[in-house]
């Protein structure tokens, strides 16, 4: 995400300095902005050997004067001062929509860290000049949404990526979203494949399935099928045991997964008295709004 050759970063939302430290580990010199006096002292102490500059002020009030930067980094606060949760349609404080143009006069690149609950289509609508959007997960749980916006727009389309890391920060996969023509299977085949949340968030499910040789069960449904066993990184893989037009009466336990289905998981679990099971799964599907429903009983294999 950090542009190649970037040496000086302005971190407008330094907080305790975790992200600041990350930039410094990449060899960057960082200017930090933080209004809390206690955190300012912490930032100064922890940065005493790194050449770090700390500015005690709010991000909205900071002015760089004659300083120049390669990247401006902003992680907007997702809580109001009252402690109330900001709606996900609100990008937080400082609001990038209000200040982006100013930040781009300070550096050729702005890097935003947003709530991972923000939809990629909203990101592309709000920041049409973004050249890179990354949904970052750790052990399959989406943790962050990173958006990179250059001062000079690229002629290329915005690149969307799903990236997963292990607990030590090592990448386990990096999967791009791309426009692909995915074949539709005539029926559910011997195996099904469920993409990770980061892939779904980035819109990379179809490109992952295409690269893995899977087929679509239904257009727009983030579940795929194949005739072969797979351990492709980026999702969970299952062997199909049976397919039904209704939930089997003898199914006593299963983890329930819904795909474009009108009823919620807990409602189905209560209605049919199905206990939790970590190995056997019930996939409840509906093929489009008002379409046919089907139920797949499957065993997880990877």
PLM region descriptions:
Residues 1-302:
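SAM-dependent transferase fold signal centered on methyltransferase-like domains
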């Amino acid at each position: 995400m950090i542009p190649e050759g970037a040496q000086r970063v302005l971190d407008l939302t330094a907080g305790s300095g975790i992200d600041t430290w990350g930039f410094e580990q990449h060899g960057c010199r960082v200017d930090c902005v933080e209004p809390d006096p206690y955190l300012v002292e912490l930032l100064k102490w922890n940065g005493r050997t790194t050449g770090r500059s700390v500015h005690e002020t709010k991000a909205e009030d900071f002015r760089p004067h004659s300083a120049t930067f390669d990247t401006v980094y902003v992680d907007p606060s997702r809580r109001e001062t009252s402690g109330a949760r900001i709606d996900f349609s609100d990008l937080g404080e400082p609001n990038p929509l209000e200040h982006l143009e100013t930040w781009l006069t300070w550096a050729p690149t702005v890097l935003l860290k947003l709530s991972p609950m923000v939809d990629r289509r909203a990101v592309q609508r709000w920041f049409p000049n973004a050249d890179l959007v990354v949904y970052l997960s750790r052990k399959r749980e989406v943790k962050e949404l990173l958006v990179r916006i250059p001062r000079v727009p690229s002629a290329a389309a915005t690149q969307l990526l799903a990236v997963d890391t292990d607990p030590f920060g090592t990448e386990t996969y990096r999967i791009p979203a791309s426009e692909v023509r995915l074949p539709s299977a005539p029926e559910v085949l011997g195996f099904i494949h469920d993409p990770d949340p980061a892939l779904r968030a980035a819109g990379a499910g179809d490109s992952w399935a295409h690269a893995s040789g899977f087929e679509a069960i239904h257009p727009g449904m983030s579940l795929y099928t194949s005739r072969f066993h797979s351990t492709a990184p980026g999702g969970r893989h299952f062997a199909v045991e049976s397919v039904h037009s209704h939930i089997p009466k003898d199914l006593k336990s299963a983890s329930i997964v819904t795909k474009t289905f009108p009823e919620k998981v807990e409602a189905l679990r209560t209605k049919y008295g199905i206990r939790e099971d970590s190995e056997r799964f019930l996939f409840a599907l509906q093929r489009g709004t008002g379409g046919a429903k089907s139920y797949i009983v499957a065993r997880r294999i990877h």
